[in-house]
Protein backbone atom coordinates (compact mmCIF):
# COMPACT_ATOMS: atom_id res chain seq x y z
CA UNK A 1 0.00 0.00 0.00
CA UNK A 2 1.60 3.26 -1.16
CA UNK A 3 -0.69 5.57 0.82
CA UNK A 4 -3.84 5.28 2.91
CA UNK A 5 -6.52 7.95 2.65
CA UNK A 6 -8.87 8.94 5.47
CA UNK A 7 -11.83 11.19 4.55
CA UNK A 8 -14.09 12.59 7.25
CA UNK A 9 -16.71 15.22 8.03
CA UNK A 10 -15.99 15.67 11.73
CA UNK A 11 -13.12 15.14 14.15
CA UNK A 12 -13.92 11.44 14.57
CA UNK A 13 -11.79 10.76 11.50
CA UNK A 14 -8.78 12.43 13.08
CA UNK A 15 -8.90 9.97 15.98
CA UNK A 16 -9.11 7.05 13.55
CA UNK A 17 -6.20 8.37 11.49
CA UNK A 18 -4.06 8.98 14.56
CA UNK A 19 -4.78 5.49 15.90
CA UNK A 20 -3.59 4.00 12.60
CA UNK A 21 -0.56 6.30 12.62
CA UNK A 22 0.42 5.00 16.06
CA UNK A 23 0.04 1.40 14.85
CA UNK A 24 2.00 2.00 11.63
CA UNK A 25 4.24 5.08 12.14
CA UNK A 26 5.95 4.60 8.76
CA UNK A 27 2.71 4.41 6.78
CA UNK A 28 2.11 7.31 4.38
CA UNK A 29 -1.35 8.80 4.94
CA UNK A 30 -3.53 11.55 3.49
CA UNK A 31 -6.29 13.07 5.63
CA UNK A 32 -9.14 14.93 3.92
CA UNK A 33 -11.54 17.01 6.03
CA UNK A 34 -14.77 17.99 4.25
CA UNK A 35 -17.27 19.27 6.85
CA UNK A 36 -20.00 20.70 4.63
CA UNK A 37 -22.74 19.11 2.56
CA UNK A 38 -24.82 15.98 2.88
CA UNK A 39 -23.39 12.56 3.56
CA UNK A 40 -24.24 11.56 -0.02
CA UNK A 41 -22.28 14.52 -1.42
CA UNK A 42 -19.38 13.74 0.91
CA UNK A 43 -19.17 10.14 -0.30
CA UNK A 44 -19.40 11.08 -3.98
CA UNK A 45 -16.82 13.87 -3.72
CA UNK A 46 -14.48 11.71 -1.66
CA UNK A 47 -14.37 9.02 -4.33
CA UNK A 48 -13.65 11.66 -6.96
CA UNK A 49 -10.94 13.36 -4.89
CA UNK A 50 -9.20 10.13 -3.96
CA UNK A 51 -9.11 9.36 -7.67
CA UNK A 52 -7.47 12.72 -8.39
CA UNK A 53 -4.87 11.98 -5.70
CA UNK A 54 -4.37 8.46 -7.08
CA UNK A 55 -5.17 6.94 -3.69
CA UNK A 56 -6.56 3.44 -4.16
CA UNK A 57 -6.99 2.51 -0.51
CA UNK A 58 -9.02 4.76 1.74
CA UNK A 59 -11.67 4.89 4.45
CA UNK A 60 -14.59 7.25 4.85
CA UNK A 61 -15.21 7.91 8.53
CA UNK A 62 -18.56 9.09 9.86
CA UNK A 63 -19.96 8.73 13.41
CA UNK A 64 -22.82 6.62 12.00
CA UNK A 65 -22.90 3.99 9.28
CA UNK A 66 -23.20 5.29 5.72
CA UNK A 67 -23.79 3.69 2.33
CA UNK A 68 -20.23 4.35 1.22
CA UNK A 69 -18.38 1.36 -0.18
CA UNK A 70 -15.31 2.36 1.85
CA UNK A 71 -17.31 3.20 4.98
CA UNK A 72 -15.49 2.47 8.26
CA UNK A 73 -18.30 0.30 9.59
CA UNK A 74 -18.40 -1.79 6.42
CA UNK A 75 -14.65 -2.14 5.89
CA UNK A 76 -13.33 -2.33 9.46
CA UNK A 77 -16.28 -3.76 11.41
CA UNK A 78 -17.69 -5.75 8.51
CA UNK A 79 -16.43 -9.10 9.74
CA UNK A 80 -18.47 -8.92 12.93
CA UNK A 81 -16.97 -9.72 16.30
CA UNK A 82 -18.23 -11.61 19.32
CA UNK A 83 -18.48 -9.79 22.62
CA UNK A 84 -20.28 -6.92 24.31
CA UNK A 85 -20.44 -4.03 21.85
CA UNK A 86 -19.37 -0.68 23.25
CA UNK A 87 -21.48 1.64 21.12
CA UNK A 88 -24.65 3.74 21.30
CA UNK A 89 -26.60 1.01 23.05
CA UNK A 90 -28.28 -0.09 19.82
CA UNK A 91 -26.44 -3.41 19.84
CA UNK A 92 -24.64 -3.43 23.16
CA UNK A 93 -23.66 -1.07 25.96
CA UNK A 94 -24.47 2.63 25.68
CA UNK A 95 -21.15 4.49 25.94
CA UNK A 96 -22.51 7.88 24.88
CA UNK A 97 -20.21 9.88 27.17
CA UNK A 98 -17.26 8.65 25.15
CA UNK A 99 -19.06 9.56 21.93
CA UNK A 100 -19.60 13.10 23.21
CA UNK A 101 -15.92 13.37 24.14
CA UNK A 102 -14.93 12.32 20.62
CA UNK A 103 -17.35 14.66 18.84
CA UNK A 104 -16.11 17.56 21.01
CA UNK A 105 -12.47 16.74 20.27
CA UNK A 106 -11.75 15.97 23.92
CA UNK A 107 -11.19 12.21 23.80
CA UNK A 108 -7.47 12.65 24.50
CA UNK A 109 -8.09 14.42 27.81
CA UNK A 110 -7.39 12.75 31.16
CA UNK A 111 -11.02 12.79 32.37
CA UNK A 112 -11.78 10.06 29.82
CA UNK A 113 -9.93 7.60 32.07
CA UNK A 114 -12.54 8.13 34.78
CA UNK A 115 -15.32 7.49 32.26
CA UNK A 116 -13.68 4.23 31.19
CA UNK A 117 -13.42 3.09 34.80
CA UNK A 118 -17.09 3.93 35.34
CA UNK A 119 -18.16 1.87 32.32
CA UNK A 120 -15.93 -1.00 33.43
CA UNK A 121 -17.67 -1.11 36.81
CA UNK A 122 -21.06 -1.41 35.08
CA UNK A 123 -20.06 -4.41 32.99
CA UNK A 124 -21.04 -7.82 34.32
CA UNK A 125 -18.22 -9.92 35.72
CA UNK A 126 -19.44 -12.73 33.45
CA UNK A 127 -18.51 -10.68 30.38
CA UNK A 128 -15.50 -12.18 28.61
CA UNK A 129 -15.03 -9.71 25.74
CA UNK A 130 -15.92 -6.14 24.85
CA UNK A 131 -15.68 -4.78 21.31
CA UNK A 132 -14.60 -1.22 20.45
CA UNK A 133 -17.47 -0.92 18.00
CA UNK A 134 -17.36 2.80 17.11
CA UNK A 135 -14.78 4.79 15.14
CA UNK A 136 -12.37 6.71 17.34
CA UNK A 137 -12.35 4.29 20.26
CA UNK A 138 -9.12 2.67 19.01
CA UNK A 139 -7.30 5.91 19.79
CA UNK A 140 -7.37 4.87 23.46
CA UNK A 141 -7.36 1.10 23.03
CA UNK A 142 -4.58 0.69 25.59
CA UNK A 143 -6.64 2.57 28.19
CA UNK A 144 -9.65 0.36 27.44
CA UNK A 145 -7.43 -2.68 28.02
CA UNK A 146 -6.15 -1.29 31.30
CA UNK A 147 -9.63 -0.49 32.59
CA UNK A 148 -11.39 -3.68 31.55
CA UNK A 149 -8.36 -5.79 32.32
CA UNK A 150 -9.14 -5.31 36.01
CA UNK A 151 -12.03 -7.73 35.45
CA UNK A 152 -9.94 -9.90 33.13
CA UNK A 153 -12.10 -8.82 30.19
CA UNK A 154 -10.53 -9.02 26.73
CA UNK A 155 -10.80 -5.89 24.59
CA UNK A 156 -11.32 -6.52 20.87
CA UNK A 157 -10.17 -3.65 18.66
CA UNK A 158 -11.51 -4.15 15.09
CA UNK A 159 -9.34 -1.34 13.70
CA UNK A 160 -6.15 -2.91 15.04
CA UNK A 161 -7.13 -6.27 13.56
CA UNK A 162 -7.96 -4.65 10.20
CA UNK A 163 -4.60 -2.86 10.12
CA UNK A 164 -2.78 -6.07 11.00
CA UNK A 165 -4.54 -7.95 8.18
CA UNK A 166 -4.45 -5.34 5.44
CA UNK A 167 -1.65 -2.84 5.94
CA UNK A 168 1.69 -4.50 5.30
CA UNK A 169 3.71 -2.06 3.20
CA UNK A 170 5.23 0.99 4.82
CA UNK A 171 6.69 4.27 3.61
CA UNK A 172 8.41 7.10 5.43
CA UNK A 173 5.54 8.25 7.63
CA UNK A 174 4.54 11.15 5.37
CA UNK A 175 1.30 12.73 6.62
CA UNK A 176 -0.68 15.13 4.42
CA UNK A 177 -3.61 17.12 5.78
CA UNK A 178 -6.19 18.75 3.48
CA UNK A 179 -9.44 20.56 4.10
CA UNK A 180 -12.13 21.96 1.85
CA UNK A 181 -12.95 24.78 4.29
CA UNK A 182 -10.51 26.49 6.60
CA UNK A 183 -11.08 25.92 10.32
CA UNK A 184 -8.06 26.82 12.41
CA UNK A 185 -9.70 25.79 15.68
CA UNK A 186 -10.22 22.35 14.14
CA UNK A 187 -6.57 22.31 13.07
CA UNK A 188 -5.50 23.09 16.64
CA UNK A 189 -7.58 20.20 17.97
CA UNK A 190 -6.13 17.77 15.44
CA UNK A 191 -2.64 18.88 16.47
CA UNK A 192 -3.54 18.11 20.07
CA UNK A 193 -4.78 14.66 19.04
CA UNK A 194 -1.61 13.83 17.08
CA UNK A 195 0.64 15.54 19.62
CA UNK A 196 2.81 16.87 16.83
CA UNK A 197 2.70 19.88 14.48
CA UNK A 198 -0.17 19.73 11.98
CA UNK A 199 -0.81 22.03 9.04
CA UNK A 200 -3.84 21.66 6.81
CA UNK A 201 -3.71 22.83 3.20
CA UNK A 202 -6.64 23.63 0.96
CA UNK A 203 -7.63 20.71 -1.24
CA UNK A 204 -7.45 21.17 -5.03
CA UNK A 205 -7.90 18.55 -7.72
CA UNK A 206 -4.62 19.49 -9.40
CA UNK A 207 -1.45 18.17 -7.67
CA UNK A 208 0.46 21.39 -8.38
CA UNK A 209 -2.11 23.44 -6.51
CA UNK A 210 -2.01 20.94 -3.64
CA UNK A 211 1.75 21.43 -3.47
CA UNK A 212 2.49 17.78 -4.27
CA UNK A 213 4.70 18.48 -7.30
CA UNK A 214 8.15 19.94 -6.67
CA UNK A 215 9.65 22.62 -8.93
CA UNK A 216 12.22 20.19 -10.35
CA UNK A 217 9.48 17.72 -11.27
CA UNK A 218 7.50 20.50 -12.98
CA UNK A 219 10.53 21.44 -15.06
CA UNK A 220 11.16 17.85 -16.14
CA UNK A 221 7.53 17.40 -17.15
CA UNK A 222 7.66 20.49 -19.38
CA UNK A 223 10.72 19.24 -21.29
Place the predicted regions along the sequence by residue.
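Non-catalytic structural scaffold of enzyme domains
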Residues: 1-223
Amino acid sequence: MDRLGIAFQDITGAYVACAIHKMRPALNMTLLFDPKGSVEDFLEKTENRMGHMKIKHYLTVHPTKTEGRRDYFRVVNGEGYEGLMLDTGAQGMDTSLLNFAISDGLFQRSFVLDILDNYMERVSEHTEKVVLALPGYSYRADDFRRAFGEKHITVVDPLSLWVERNIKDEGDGDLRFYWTDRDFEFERRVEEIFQEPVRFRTYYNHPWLRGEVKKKERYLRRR
